Regions:
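N-terminal pre-domain/capping segments
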Residues: 1-106
């Protein structure tokens, strides 16, 4: 069995907020830091409210993520979805959101 250790996104750079799950403004810099560690991955996340600045939501952003992942020799992407924490799973809007997220993740 192979055990992997990673870190949640936003823990390797400073944020201007006391919010625990705040998407980092300069997310790509975290890959520079992870190269200096023996960590296996950075766990991306979505926030409780839709954040269009998160690169997971655009094809161009996904290309940037893939490029950064390959530069640190990581082979996979791990995502934690926080949107469903504050949005009911039985709502149509949440269903649409989750379908969009799944469609975006298929680009990896």
């Amino acid at each position: 069995m192979s055990i992997k250790f990673g870190i949640m996104q936003g823990r390797l750079t400073k944020t201007n907020s006391n919010v625990l799950q705040k998407f980092p403004t300069d997310w790509s810099k975290e890959f520079d830091f992870i190269k200096k560690t023996s960590l296996d991955y950075i766990e991306f996340f979505t926030e409780k409210n839709f954040n269009k600045k998160n690169p997971l939501w655009s094809n161009n952003g996904i290309k940037k993520i893939k490029k950064k992942i390959s530069k640190v020799n990581h082979k996979e992407i791990i995502v934690c979805d926080n949107y469903v924490i504050s949005h009911s799973l039985d709502k149509i809007s949440t269903e649409k959101y989750l379908k969009l997220l799944i469609d975006q993740l298929k680009n990896f």
